[in-house]
Amino acid sequence: MKCLNNSDIEKELQRLGRTYLTGDLKNFTDLNYIKTSGLEIGISKYEEFKYDKAHLHKWNNEYNYVLEGEIKVYIFSEAKEYHFKKGDLFNIEPNMAYMTKSIAGTDILFVKSPGGNDKSLIDISDNNQFLEWTKSWEEKMI
């Protein structure tokens, strides 16, 4: 049997704000994660308001379950903002460009399948509306 204990998970979340619990990881982590292929599971913890840079995943389906707090997700291809709260689940499909912002106290459990580092950043530096959206929770996309 393989397992991870809460104190090790919490220590890594305090250090980085995000940790992978399972996967075949290439990036450095102090957590002795459970090595798997075909699936990655992790947690993101946002102690304060934060936005994640615009990006897409080339081949991963990403499922996100809101454990605590709230998150807004902007999907570029739909030109639409979604608002998710505690208990909500949402799926980001492969090649779906998006950006997120979370209020303080938000925790997300994420699952990526089939796994692997496929993140590709999207440059929004020339779009003032997108940049303004990332600065505050209240800012809405028109």
Task: Tell me what each language-model feature is.
Residues 31-34, 43, 52-58, 75, ...:
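Short histidine-centered beta-strand/loop micro-motifs
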Residues 86-91, 127:
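A short, sequence-level motif marking secondary-structure junctions
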Residues 51-53, 72, 80, 89-90, ...:
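Histidine-centered metal-chelating micro-motifs
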Residues 1-45, 51-54, 126, 132-142:
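A short, N-terminal "cap"/entry segment at the start of jelly-roll beta-barrel domains
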Residues 94-121:
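Ligand-binding loop in jelly-roll beta-barrel domains
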